[in-house]
């Protein structure tokens, strides 16, 4: 399956075209392993290179929030984002009804993944929702702003309806998730409604949101700040995206 749906791909074609016509040299598949003001150390086309620059714009993107929990290193336990990429690129998740998948966490990525799993015929034993009702109430105050981007709201509603039609059991207010098994995942244990429950599963896909990927900027000792609401560290930038390190700016997450 394609990584983007046709509408998303079409929306990005204009940006790609303008970039291709800008005169910038494009090196796909490059690995950056060193960064300092005015210099980038990397591997391009299998060769180590050092590039000099008057200014560097870093776009490290985001990553899934790491969520350690009992049994999280067992084979069969992985992040939802990684599982979605595997599913769409190679269809590696089993559609065997005797090898059910459990989703755990909260956020729109789980909606997207659940839809892709259902399309691929992968059975979903349950969705363990770890979201807090208090946060949902807080988010409700932002709903009127949705009228400014109705296509995006419609996309979210479409994903939610797909899960409802698939009759995925959604268990709310889940806490204390544990992955249990000897040499691979055998069941998922969790608390909900004041009781402990368990579900047989061969795969557990956990997701608790996206956070900025800060590794390369931390290596530069760039100034970061803690977001107490989103609960992550992020680079401190000015209105033009400049970081606290001279000659280094950031774009995106």
Describe each region flagged by the PLM.
Residues 1-253:
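Residues forming the flavin
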């Amino acid at each position: 399956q394609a990584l983007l749906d046709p509408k998303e791909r079409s929306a990005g074609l204009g940006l790609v075209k303008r970039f291709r016509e800008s005169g910038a040299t494009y090196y796909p598949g490059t690995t950056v392993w060193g960064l300092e003001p005015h210099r980038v150390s990397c591997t391009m086309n299998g060769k180590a290179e050092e590039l000099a620059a008057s200014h560097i714009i870093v776009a490290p993107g985001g990553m899934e929030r790491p969520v350690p929990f009992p049994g999280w290193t067992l084979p069969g336990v992985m992040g939802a984002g990684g599982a979605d990429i595997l599913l769409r690129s190679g269809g590696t998740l089993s559609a065997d009804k005797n090898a059910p998948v459990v989703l755990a966490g909260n956020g729109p990525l789980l909606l997207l993944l659940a839809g892709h799993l259902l399309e691929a015929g992968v059975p979903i034993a349950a969705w363990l929702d770890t979201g807090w009702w208090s946060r949902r109430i807080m988010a409700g105050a932002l709903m009127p702003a949705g009228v400014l981007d109705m296509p995006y709201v419609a996309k979210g509603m479409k994903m939610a309806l797909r899960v409802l039609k698939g009759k995925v059991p959604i268990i709310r207010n889940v806490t204390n998730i544990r992955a249990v098994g000897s040499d691979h995942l055998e069941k998922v244990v969790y608390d909900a409604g004041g009781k402990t429950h368990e579900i047989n599963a061969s795969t557990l896909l956990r997701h608790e949101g996206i956070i900025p990927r800060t590794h390369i900027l931390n290596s530069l000792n760039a100034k970061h700040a803690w977001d107490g609401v989103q609960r992550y560290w992020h680079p401190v930038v000015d209105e033009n995206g400049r970081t606290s390190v001279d000659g280094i700016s950031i774009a995106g997450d």
